[in-house]
Amino acid sequence: MAKKSMIARDVKRKKTVERYAAKRAALMAAFNAAEDPMDRLEIHRKIQALPRNSARIRVRNRCWATGKPRGVYRDFGLCRNQLRERAHKGELPGVVKSSW
């Protein structure tokens, strides 16, 4: 199990990303559309003025059951250990052991 403080930090980052998503997307679109270097510089400064944690890249993909940050399968949101346990118990619909 991951530290509760790390999980809480990640939850806080997700909320910050949500809050600033529209503003960041608008600034990025303007930045990519601007051709004048001075305009691009000004828009870049506005992007840099946003909180660091408002960037999507800062959010860590974590297992929703244990909070582990590594070995997380995107399709399920579970770490590899939990995925294996739950698949064996039959708790994941459509997941079967492979055999050939």
UniProtKB/Swiss-Prot annotation:
Alphabetic keyword roster: Ribonucleoprotein, Ribosomal protein, RNA-binding, rRNA-binding
GO cellular component: cytoplasm; small ribosomal subunit
GO molecular function, one term: rRNA binding
Top-level taxon of the source organism: Bacteria
A Gene Ontology biological process term: translation
Assembly information from the UniProt record: Part of the 30S ribosomal subunit. Contacts proteins S3 and S10.
Protein function: Binds 16S rRNA, required for the assembly of 30S particles and may also be responsible for determining the conformation of the 16S rRNA at the A site.
Family: Belongs to the universal ribosomal protein uS14 family.
The protein's name: Small ribosomal subunit protein uS14
Source organism of this protein record: Synechococcus sp. (strain CC9605)
